[in-house]
């Protein structure tokens, strides 16, 4: 699963960089040996501790937060959703999340004070806070959006070397700490079922399903994420 998770990370970061006029190919070969794992081998992917600092990830004991429960039963008889659909759903959900918190994301520069020496610490602290009370799909979207914003900020500040590092940190965290919850809650198929086909934006417009899952996922994630950003000095 490590390669497919990394593929999701790279696709999302590529998309976010392209929105700002940057190309992933400009940065993908920078310190490539730090982020690329030989195909089919998760254990050989370099961990964040070997890049910049020691990880101290912590998650709540219970994975069910804010109404996030398993959906696997509704998907038992369904074919596996193509990776392309997962990528598209992540892109759309990320866009919707950032639209709702546009002002806060535009303030990342002054809040994080990124440098090559402190980027990992900033990433670690925000992600720890984001998942402190557990995992849900909205917080996973926030996780991807934060990583994308961090990459764009790094490039804007001419610290392109951080892009490949951030991709590695995200892939490692996704594999080690989010993958178990994802599998217990129906896998990425469930994510596409909830967030695919621009569901977040459509729900916001129609309000029919918006209060049921978006407010208990994305909005809570936004509050947690932005709270962790703005509490930093």
Curated annotation (Swiss-Prot):
Record GO terms (molecular function): BH3 domain binding; channel activity; identical protein binding; protein kinase binding
SUPFAM superfamilies tied to this protein: Bcl-2 inhibitors of programmed cell death
Record PTM: Proteolytically cleaved by caspases during apoptosis. The cleaved protein, lacking the BH4 motif, has pro-apoptotic activity. Phosphorylated on Ser-62 by CDK1. This phosphorylation is partial in normal mitotic cells, but complete in G2-arrested cells upon DNA-damage, thus promoting subsequent apoptosis probably by triggering caspases-mediated proteolysis. Phosphorylated by PLK3, leading to regulate the G2 checkpoint and progression to cytokinesis during mitosis. Phosphorylation at Ser-49 appears during the S phase and G2, disappears rapidly in early mitosis during prometaphase, metaphase and early anaphase, and re-appears during telophase and cytokinesis.
Residue numbers of Phosphoserine PTMs: 49, 62
Keywords for the protein's UniProt record, in alphabetical order: Apoptosis, Cytoplasm, Cytoplasmic vesicle, Cytoskeleton, Endocytosis, Membrane, Mitochondrion, Mitochondrion inner membrane, Mitochondrion outer membrane, Nucleus, Phosphoprotein, Synapse, Transmembrane, Transmembrane helix, Ubl conjugation
Residue intervals passing through the bilayer: 210-226
Annotated site, Cleavage, chain positions: 61-62
Location of the region described as Disordered in the Swiss-Prot/TrEMBL record: 28-71
A GO cellular component annotation in the UniProt record: mitochondrial matrix
Short motif (BH1): ranges: 129-148
Sequence motif: BH3, positions: 86-100
Motif placement: BH2: 180-195
Motif (BH4): 4-24
InterPro entries: Apop_reg_BclX, Bcl-2-like_sf, Bcl-2_BH1-3, Bcl-2_fam, Bcl2-like, Bcl2/BclX, Bcl2_BH1_motif_CS, Bcl2_BH2_motif_CS
One Gene Ontology biological process: ovarian follicle development
Domain notes: The BH4 motif is required for anti-apoptotic activity. The BH1 and BH2 motifs are required for both heterodimerization with other Bcl-2 family members and for repression of cell death. The loop between motifs BH4 and BH3 is required for the interaction with NLRP1.
Function as written in the Swiss-Prot or TrEMBL entry: Potent inhibitor of cell death. Inhibits activation of caspases. Appears to regulate cell death by blocking the voltage-dependent anion channel (VDAC) by binding to it and preventing the release of the caspase activator, CYC1, from the mitochondrial membrane. Also acts as a regulator of G2 checkpoint and progression to cytokinesis during mitosis.
Family recorded in the similarity comment: Belongs to the Bcl-2 family.
Assembly and binders: Homodimer. Interacts with BCL2L11. Interacts with BAD. Interacts with PGAM5. Interacts with HEBP2. Interacts with p53/TP53 and BBC3; interaction with BBC3 disrupts the interaction with p53/TP53. Interacts with ATP5F1A and ATP5F1B; the interactions mediate the association of isoform Bcl-X(L) with the mitochondrial membrane ATP synthase F(1)F(0) ATP synthase. Interacts with VDAC1. Interacts with BCL2L11 (via BH3). Interacts with RNF183. Interacts with GIMAP3/IAN4 and GIMAP5/IAN5.
Record protein name field: Bcl-2-like protein 1
Annotated organism of origin: Homo sapiens
